[in-house]
A protein has these predicted regions:
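An N-terminal assembly and electron-transfer interface module characteristic of large anaerobic redox
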Residues: 1-346
Length: 346
């Protein structure tokens, strides 16, 4: 068959398109054939435009589900009261249901910073004072600048020295010092109060001891004019909201695993720190795994599993986030399902 005959038989049209699957906005060229098929070039990923012949079933992506569930407590647009801006970064990825519920129950309006992207990151990068600090910390600067641009009344990022101690066998439940104290860095580098007239509130709190938690939050919220009784009621509601969120994650992870076992599907526990569910931080690794037809669960599935690891691991188990990863690794290693594997993000 002559080349001219082939070209005539397979006539096609071309199109230039912009992929809106993320903020990169890749320029994609499409070749559309008469039989309804298409071929794409210029795409840097296969999230929207791809040339796969057989589209396989995507796996469950619990990173995406966790992100949506975490930030489902956002204040309604018509809410009144002082606007409390909360940056979407670091320790907020652990306790946002608590803080969102607390402030709303006290009559404040919660304003969450925008989702992470390169544009948001670049708005704060000039205020980063240490180049060797971790990327999640650098990203916090962009989130704070986003809240400043949106004109909130106050910005809130607390000193959380201790997280909840989830296991009695663990030595302690310290937070990473960067996660705990980054409010002080923001105050020094951006100076929201001095330069923009927006105070940055950073009360010292501990989730390890509920009595101390209530005392410290009462002292802080009294300063904002909230009555004592309302404060204590709000804290109770906030603790319930946080626990409901954690319980939902655990149930969902175990359910995904059970469903996968029933159909002999592969499951990867993508163990990570809370802020790794930010798509910009984890580079959509979870999405890439799910695109291969593999179910992705989080370390939350092992919340009440694998506590015996503390007597065997050769490490000082005093850090809240790594303690969970130790438990998750031990649980996956001991699990009887042969298609359950673990990947850790660092």
């Amino acid at each position: 068959m002559k080349l001219s005959t082939i070209l005539h038989t397979n006539q096609f049209s071309e199109s230039n398109e912009v992929c809106l699957g993320c903020t990169n906005h890749c320029q994609v060229r499409g070749y559309h054939f008469q039989n309804g098929k298409a071929y794409y070039s210029g795409n840097n990923c296969e999230k929207v435009y791809h040339n796969q012949r057989d589209v396989q079933q995507r796996g469950v992506n619990m990173f995406e589900e966790k992100y949506k569930l975490l930030f489902a407590h956002t204040t309604l647009p018509n809410s009144q009261g002082i606007a409390i801006g909360i940056p979407r970064g670091l320790g907020i990825y652990e306790n946002y249901p608590f803080w969102s519920t607390l402030f709303q129950q006290c009559g404040f309006r919660v304003v969450l910073s925008a989702t992470s992207n390169n544009t948001l990151y670049e708005k704060g990068v000039r205020t980063v004072v240490a180049d060797n600090i971790c990327f999640p910390a650098k990203l916090m600067h962009g989130h704070v600048m986003n809240l400043i641009e949106r004109g909130v009344d106050r910005i809130f990022y607390p000193w959380v020295v201790f997280e909840r101690k989830e296991d009695k066998q663990a030595k302690n439940s310290f937070n990473c010092p960067i996660v705990s104290g980054y409010a002080d860095v923001i105050k020094s580098s951006i100076d929201p109060a001095g330069k923009y007239g927006i105070p940055l509130d950073s009360p010292i709190v501990s989730f390890k001891d509920e009595e101390l938690l209530r005392e410290s939050l009462q002292a802080y919220l009294q300063g904002l004019g909230v009555a004592d009784k309302q404060i204590q009621t709000a804290i109770t509601h906030a603790l319930h909201a946080q626990q409901s969120y954690l319980d939902a994650l655990e149930r969902r992870g175990l359910q995904v695993l059970a469903d996968a076992q029933a159909t002999n599907r592969m499951v990867i526990m993508l163990a990570a720190r809370p802020y790794h569910i930010d798509p910009l931080i984890q580079h959509k690794i979870a999405d890439a795994i799910a695109a291969m037809g593999i179910d992705v669960i989080t370390e939350n599935a092992a919340t009440h599993q694998g506590s015996e690891v503390y007597g065997q691991v050769n490490a000082l188990c005093q850090w809240a986030y790594p303690n969970r990863i130790f438990k998750a690794a031990y649980w996956v290693g001991k699990h009887t399902y042969p298609h359950l594997h673990m990947v850790q993000l660092t």
